[in-house]
Amino acid sequence: SCASNRPNRVHKQVMTQRTQVTLTFDQHEYKTNCMLKVWKNELIVLSVMPVMGIELFRLEATPDQVTIIDKLNRRYTIMTYEEINKLSPRRISYKMLQLLINKAEKEINFDLQAGTHTLQLKANMGQREYNNQKEPQMVNTNKYKQVSLREILPI
């Protein structure tokens, strides 16, 4: 039969949720539409799409690290949770992020102090959808230049 000729694809359940995010960084406020996807215990993706569904920024969190991709300027930065936790007294881990998302029904509020800078994130959560999808696709960073976090976020 035809079905026997197809390669086996592993499908996993992914939670998808549209969100409206307000990011306040040192008194400057930015509002944007985002798409949040969570593959349990594997990957959290936050796609920032402010205009017509075009992804300009992307945050990919795995259990080991966080990658911030600036697609507009073709650059990215990678940080371990240990490096992130050196910037702020608030401890952050993959499990904590996943728990925060799972428990949030309508809204997520998150404040982060990095030196003299304050970053506040407020996300209005839309309807959650659960679907089976193939393995998560991470951005191929070979197309981008690796830079420091300070080049992407001036902290």
Segments from the language model and where they lie:
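Start-of-domain marker
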Residues: 3-64
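Generic "edge-of-domain/loop-turn" microfeature
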Residues: 26-28, 43, 53, 66, ...
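Non-transmembrane domains of secretory- and envelope-associated proteins
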Residues: 72, 108-155
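An acidic-aromatic
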Residues: 43-95
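Detector for Asparagine
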Residues: 5-8, 33, 41, 73, ...
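Charged, gly/pro-rich active-site loop segments
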Residues: 91-114
